[in-house]
């Protein structure tokens, strides 16, 4: 019986083993079929990857094949993009043909000095991995759109652009002397009334409106001091004169910010705040809280006080509060009658109609409410009334009508229509064939024609730059509008100081421009130091040269306004996600408006980027701090040099660099330097 059982068990076991082997064979067969279907795609990917040898490989002189996988592959295969230099070997100077020397301009190609491959490296990473980071996807899209945009530039006839027309608006606008809008029309226009040609001295704007009743708002800062969870009653509104045409796609500068706060101010009193703002950087506020300002001649504005007096309650005091009624009667009885001072309450009240008149005077703005002068705000350097091309009214107020009269009837002097001045006086010298002291890369947006022109007319006229002891170049990407790109190309060909990067410009990709500056400073010129700055940064070139001359040439240098242990903002407008920056703090980094690195650091950055080992982050100044930290740890010690005179927020005394300077402020700062007075034109 045991033998029979044993035979029976063995039969069952062999049957199960037979079924398992069949199952494994089926899986193997399915896998072979899968490979057969995927093998052609695999061969195609291998061919694409093997077609690029990186930055150190030899490429042709005139073309660069850009290949992308996935759904974008068919769109970009076999795309030829021009590159004017040899891709292999070091290049130190620009070669200029005799014809170009005679004509004074050169034909601009889309990939100057191999910069297409900077963003191209980001693209090639897509061929090496299925998953792309948000940054890589963004760069991917910008590269493709930029390549197409550059092709469209060749089809666009720049000569057909009317110099009197705005390349931002696409049409010539009339300059009416008066404009009126009712409340409904204003709401349909997002509460903005256009003033096509700005204001002039004597222009006035009358606003008829009613402040809304206070509502509760959360103020987290107050929750620590009170038990109301930070909830306060707020009733306020803003009247702003904005420069709508001074920056396309940017926050317009606020030439005047008028903010009546009926309830909700931090001092629990009604106030009227006046200020200016340029590129989201506010100036010093002028606050009127009912205390009259001085009558000294140096603080008056066209003879008016900056702040008038009003009472702190709703009762109108017809007699000075320091005097009692008895004292006043006694003085009149003995013949020493004193004329009582008339005071008024705060000019705005919830639910009550007001008539506000804003008038542009000779030295400043004057605000009248109900026919009474309330405050005056002096014009600030760099902000001109002719640039005030829009009136915005926001906040807790119902507007019934707005009337603007005596407006400017001609286009502003610094408008984009007149931004570029094609004069040989402002042309850049050619790149020198010998080493020089400092290379300066200036980041600029495509449509910043006024900013670039202001830089050419000011600190780029420094003798060190004119003699090529210092070399400066703009680094500019492309714009969605083909007429803007066409004008950029014309500007670059004429002045010879622009390096065009063929990807679509956006803030998150500024770091690619920084890498381009490093590559240019290493492979196309010979300078021991490289400086990065912005087109709204005014540079005192002689001060910068003195600073780098004080550093030993053997040392690696990182100089600027350094930040230590700064943390990413995880909430709000400038949020940095944990995916973008997983660390809790940033490395030490210099503020982006102006910093200096030695050339060996730039070489390290270019080398790491060519080997795909460079970490890219959307904040270019933080990225530079990270790269310098890695260089300091792996290569050789770096001398970190800090100075507050690399001013991040505006201008400071004895500055090296001044940030957030408008074109008018640039001219003012340059005039001061020529007079031997390095003074700020607008303290912030």
Swiss-Prot record:
Q: Which CDD domains did the record assign?
A: GLECT
Q: Where is the Galectin domain?
A: 191-405
Which GO terms fall under biological process for this protein?
arabinogalactan protein metabolic process; protein O-linked glycosylation via hydroxyproline; root hair cell development
Q: Which cofactor does it need?
A: Mn(2+)
Question: Upon deletion of the gene, what happens?
Answer: Reduced levels of arabinogalactan proteins. Defects in root hair growth, root elongation, pollen tube growth, flowering time, leaf development, silique length and inflorescence growth. Increased sensitivity to salt stress.
Matching PANTHER family: BETA-1,3-N-ACETYLGLUCOSAMINYLTRANSFERASE (PTHR11214), HYDROXYPROLINE O-GALACTOSYLTRANSFERASE GALT2 (PTHR11214:SF212)
Would you identify the family this protein belongs to, as annotated?
A: Belongs to the glycosyltransferase 31 family.
Protein name as annotated: Hydroxyproline O-galactosyltransferase GALT2
- State the organism of origin: Arabidopsis thaliana (Mouse-ear cress)
Q: Which gene encodes it?
A: GALT2
